[in-house]
Regions:
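Bacterial Sec-dependent N-terminal signal peptides
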Residues: 1-21
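Carbohydrate-interacting regions of secretory-pathway proteins
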Residues: 20-233
Length: 233
């Protein structure tokens, strides 16, 4: 039943993306508890990691939030609110040979240098060009450095991709362009084993937080986002 509902959710999301104005919610979405994380007009609701403001490199144009890597006011950005059990939807596209990511359960503290020190990441990357995409578990839609997907469903660079991330009492699922990429249970012995076999073993608090902020990563490349919405479960 859960798989059916998730598949139906993604189908509806795809229809809505085509039929409605970007960065808006339908009456049905509002009734179901969805909220916009990006209003299509400003960077309101976002701030740089461990800061209270957002840098000038994150800009809005024609309803799209994007990172301008030429602007010195850069850095990862996070939601103002923390989330625990949720479904997140958004669309992204990345520049040729570009790299970025969506990180959840991020803990802000002066003891951490970056959001990826604590939160697991859904990889955003140009699979066809970026050298990191040659590495197993580092391709678009993967749970970065932890779990690879057997099914590649990413669009070419500079084309839009649809994402659904579901995190519900430790049950984590990633969907990319209607194809499930990852399904795992966090906060289990198996989860800890994944961490121990990854680069994150050097960060003792990685993957431990059961709630946190949602982060859009600055990885030195041009990346665009739109239709960012969330529903708490």
């Amino acid at each position: 039943m859960r798989k059916f509902l998730m598949g139906f959710l993604i189908f509806i999301f795809a229809l809505h993306v085509q039929a409605q104005t970007i960065n808006t919610l339908t009456k049905e979405e509002k009734a179901a508890g969805w909220k916009l994380l990006f209003d299509g007009k400003s960077t309101s609701g976002w701030h740089n990691f461990n800061k209270q403001t957002i840098g000038s490199a994150w800009k809005v144009n024609e309803g799209i939030l994007f990172l301008d890597p030429r602007d010195p006011g850069r850095g990862d950005i996070l939601t103002e609110k923390e989330y625990e059990n949720f479904e997140l939807m958004l669309e992204w596209k990345v520049d040729t040979c570009g790299n970025s990511g969506i990180i959840i359960n991020v803990v802000e503290s002066s003891k951490y240098k970056a959001g990826w020190n604590t939160g697991p990441e859904m990889q955003i990357i140009d699979n066809a060009c970026h050298p990191d995409a040659k590495i197993f578990k580092h391709r678009a839609g993967n749970l970065y450095d932890l779990i690879a997907s057997p099914d590649e469903s990413v669009q070419p660079a500079r084309e839009w991709n649809k994402v659904v991330i579901s995190s519900n009492h430790g049950h984590l699922q990633f969907w990319l362009n209607d194809v499930k990429q990852v399904e795992t249970m966090m906060f289990t012995p198996e989860w800890e084993a994944l961490i121990q076999g990854s680069k994150f073993v050097a960060h003792p608090d990685f993957g431990k937080a059961q709630k946190g902020r949602i982060l859009l990563q600055d990885h030195d490349n041009l990346v665009w986002f739109r239709n960012i919405k969330i529903r708490e479960l």
